[in-house]
Curated annotation (Swiss-Prot):
UniProt-listed PANTHER family: DNAJ HOMOLOG SUBFAMILY C MEMBER 11 (PTHR44157:SF1)
The organism of origin for this protein: Dictyostelium discoideum
Database matches in InterPro entries: DnaJ-like_C11_C, DnaJ_domain, J_dom_sf, Mito_inner_membrane_organizer
Domain J: 35-103
Record keyword Chaperone present: yes
Protein name as it appears in the record: DnaJ homolog subfamily C member 11 homolog
Keyword Chaperone in annotation: yes
Gene Ontology cellular component list: mitochondrion
Length: 575
C-alpha cells in the first residue's frame, strides 16, 4: 500500500482508542454523594406540589415527635433533618438550580452565589455562563499531542557488531472542534548517517453534511524535495457502508493520482475493505477481509497492480491472556505481470509478534520479520503519549535457529520475570488495595446498614397494614425484592462479604412506597438513597430484582440501579 493510501485510510477509519478509567477519587465521590431526588423518590422535573406531597409522606413516618421510643427519636432526628434539607433545597428555585448543576458540594458553597444573584433568571444566566466556560475548557481538552521516536540499529553478523542506522522523531498534534472540523499536524526530523531532513504532514477534516466529510492533506519531505497535496471526500453510503474518493497532486512532474476506498460491514464480525489507485500508466487495487470474534483477528489481503503483479498476506492476531497478545502473518506473490514471469510465485515474508500490556498507559511489543534478504527485529515501547521503536535489521546470512533464539530469549526472560517476580508483587499489591478499600468503607457501610434497619423498623407496622389493604382488592403485593450485585454470592470465607453481603432484602421498603396498587421509582436516581435501602457494593454496578403479585398473578422484573421502575405491568407477568 502506498503512502497516500495509508494516509487516506488513517483519516477514514475511526481510531480505536482505549478507554481509560476516570480519576478514582472523583468517581467515588460522585457515587457516594446523597441524592435528594432519590430520598424523596421524585422525578428530576418534579413540581413544588409533588415535592411537598413526598415530604409529608416521609415526615409522617420519620418525624421525631411521632416516635415513642427515645432511641428511635434520636435516630430519626438525623433522617428527618436530611429529608427537610432535601425538601428545602428542591423547593427553592435558586438552590435547586445550583444543586442540579453542581450537586451537594455546590449547595455547601452556595451562600455567596445566592446572595450575589437575587433573581433566579440572573442566577441561571450565571450558571449558563459557567457551563459555557466548561464547554470552552472541554474544547481546550480536545487538543491532544503524542510523540514517537524510532531508533534503527543494524547488525552485521560477519563483523559481529551493531551500528547506528537511522533516527526519526515525530510529534502529532490533534485539534478537534465541532464547528471548524479537525486538524492534525505531524512534524518530524529524520537523521541517517550524516544527513538530516525535516518532514511535515498536515490534514484537515470538515463535515459538509451529516454523512459527508471533506478532507485535505499535505505531505512535505525535504528528502523528496517536494510535497504531495491530497483532497477528497468520505461519506456514509448506507447503514453498513462507508466510502471515500481522493486525488493527489505532486510537486514533481508526476501525473495526478486518483484513489478510492470502500468499507462494508458484511456481518457483525466480518468487514471488507477495498482500495483502488489509478495513475497514468499505473493502477493498483487491493481487497482486505477482516474477521474479529472475541478480540481474535483473522485478516486476508490481496493486492494486484500492473507493475507489481499479484500478492497477498494472511494475518492472525489472538489474545493469550488478559494483557498479552500474539500475532502471525505470512505473505507471498504470484506472476502474470511485467515484474514476474507467468506462473512465477514465491515467498515475500513472514512475521511473528508478541505484545504485552504493562499498565493502563504503557505496553511493550517484540516482533521478528523475515524476508528473503534479511531478518528484522523490532522492540517497541508504547506510552499513551510517547512511543519508542527500535528496529534491528540483520543484513548478512544468519541461521534460522540463531534468529529464533535471538527473538525468543527476551520474551522467555520477560515471562519468567513476570511469573516469578512481577506477578506475586502485583497480586500482593492488589490484595492490599482491596483491603484498604474495604476498611475505608466499612464504617460508612455499617452506618448505612444500621440506618436502613431502623427505617424498616419504623415502617414495618405501616407496611403490614398496607399489605392487608392491598390483599382485600387483589392489589400490588411485593413478594420479594433484592438489591445489589445479583450475580455475586456470599463468600463465607471472607468476613467482609459475610458482614456486607452482595445483595440485600428490600421487600419492606418497596412495599412502603406502594400507593393505590402502584409503585414508581424514578429514573436517574440512585436506589441506594431510598429510605430503607443501603449500598452493599459502593462504586459498583447494582440491580434491583422484584417479584410481586398483582390480581393474584405472579410478576417479576429486574432493572439497573438508575433505571425507572414502574409496576405493575403486563410485560412482567410470569407465564
Amino acid at each position: 500500500m502506498n503512502k497516500i493510501d495509508k494516509d487516506i485510510l488513517k483519516i477514514f477509519e475511526s481510531k480505536e482508542n482505549e478507554q481509560f478509567d476516570e480519576d478514582q477519587e472523583k468517581d467515588e465521590k460522585k457515587m457516594n454523594e446523597v441524592d435528594f431526588y432519590s430520598i424523596l423518590n421524585i422525578s428530576r422535573n418534579a413540581t413544588d406540589d409533588e415535592i411537598k406531597i413526598a415530604f409529608k409522606k416521609l415526615a409522617f413516618t420519620y418525624h421525631p415527635d411521632k416516635q415513642t421510643n427515645e432511641e428511635l427519636k434520636k435516630e430519626t432526628q438525623d433522617i428527618f433533618t436530611l429529608i427537610t434539607l432535601a425538601k428545602d433545597t428542591l423547593s427553592d428555585p435558586k438552590l435547586r438550580a445550583i444543586y442540579d448543576q453542581f450537586g451537594l458540594e455546590g449547595i455547601e458553597h452556595s451562600k455567596a452565589i445566592v446572595n450575589k444573584y437575587k433573581e433566579v433568571d440572573k442566577l441561571l444566566q450565571a450558571l449558563d455562563r459557567i457551563q459555557k466556560e466548561n464547554e470552552e475548557d472541554k474544547l481546550i481538552q480536545s487538543f491532544s499531542a503524542t510523540g514517537s521516536q524510532s531508533i534503527s540499529l543494524a547488525y552485521h553478523h560477519e563483523y559481529r557488531h551493531f551500528f547506528f542506522k537511522t533516527l526519526k522523531s515525530e510529534a502529532q498534534f490533534d485539534i478537534k472542534t465541532q464547528k471548524y472540523g479537525s486538524f492534525e499536524f505531524v512534524p518530524s526530523i529524520t537523521r541517517k548517517k550524516n544527513l538530516a531532513w525535516f518532514g511535515l504532514e498536515t490534514s484537515y477534516l470538515y463535515p459538509i453534511t451529516q454523512n459527508t466529510e471533506l478532507f485535505l492533506s499535505n505531505n512535505y519531505n525535504e528528502a523528496n524535495e517536494g510535497s504531495i497535496q491530497t483532497i477528497g471526500l468520505k461519506s456514509l453510503l448506507s447503514a453498513n457502508t462507508y466510502g471515500s474518493i481522493h486525488c493527489a497532486f505532486f510537486d514533481s512532474f508526476q501525473p495526478a493520482r486518483f484513489g478510492c476506498l470502500l468499507t462494508r460491514q458484511l456481518s457483525p464480525t466480518i468487514t471488507a475493505i477495498f482500495r483502488g489507485t489509478l495513475q497514468k500508466e499505473f493502477w493498483q487495487g487491493s481487497l482486505t477481509l477482516k474477521r474479529i470474534v472475541q478480540k481474535r483477528l483473522f485478516e486476508i489481503t490481496i493486492d494486484s497492480s500492473n507493475l507489481g503483479g499479484l500478492s497477498g498476506s494472511i494475518t492472525r492476531d489472538i489474545p493469550i491472556s488478559k494483557k498479552s497478545r500474539i500475532s502471525f502473518s505470512v505473505g507471498g506473490y504470484g506472476g502474470g505481470f511485467p515484474l514476474y514471469s507467468a506462473g512465477q510465485h514465491g515467498f515475500t515474508g513472514a512475521a511473528i509478534g508478541f505484545k504485552r500490556k504493562i499498565t493502563k498507559v504503557f505496553d511493550i511489543d517484540l516482533s521478528m520479520h523475515v524476508n528473503p534478504s534479511r531478518y528484522l527485529y523490532v522492540i517497541g515501547l508504547h506510552h499513551r503519549y510517547q512511543s519508542l521503536e527500535i528496529p534491528i535489521p540483520i543484513y548478512s546470512d544468519l541461521s534460522l535457529s540463531t534468529s529464533l533464539l535471538f527473538f525468543t530469549l527476551p520474551a522467555v526472560t520477560l515471562s519468567l520475570l513476570k511469573y516469578l517476580v512481577v506477578k506475586p508483587l502485583m497480586k500482593k499489591k492488589e490484595q492490599k488495595k482491596i483491603m484498604e478499600k474495604k476498611e475505608k468503607y466499612a464504617d460508612q457501610a455499617r452506618k448505612a446498614k444500621r440506618k436502613a434497619e431502623m427505617d424498616i423498623t419504623l415502617v414495618k407496622q405501616l407496611v403490614e397494614n398496607k399489605v392487608l389493604k392491598e390483599k382485600t382488592k387483589n392489589g400490588l403485593i411485593i413478594q420479594e425484592a433484592v438489591y445489589g450485585k445479583l450475580d455475586e454470592k456470599v463468600d463465607h470465607s471472607d468476613p467482609f462479604s459475610v458482614e456486607f453481603p452482595p445483595t440485600i432484602d428490600v421487600t419492606i421498603p418497596l412495599q412502603y412506597l406502594v400507593e393505590d396498587s402502584k409503585l414508581v421509582l424514578h429514573g436517574n436516581n440512585k436506589k441506594s438513597d431510598l429510605l430503607g435501602f443501603w449500598d452493599p457494593r459502593i462504586s459498583e454496578e447494582k440491580q434491583l430484582k422484584v417479584t410481586y403479585f398483582f390480581q393474584n398473578r405472579l410478576h417479576r422484573i429486574t432493572v439497573n440501579d438508575i433505571d425507572q421502575l414502574l409496576i405493575p405491568l403486563k410485560s412482567h407477568l410470569i407465564q
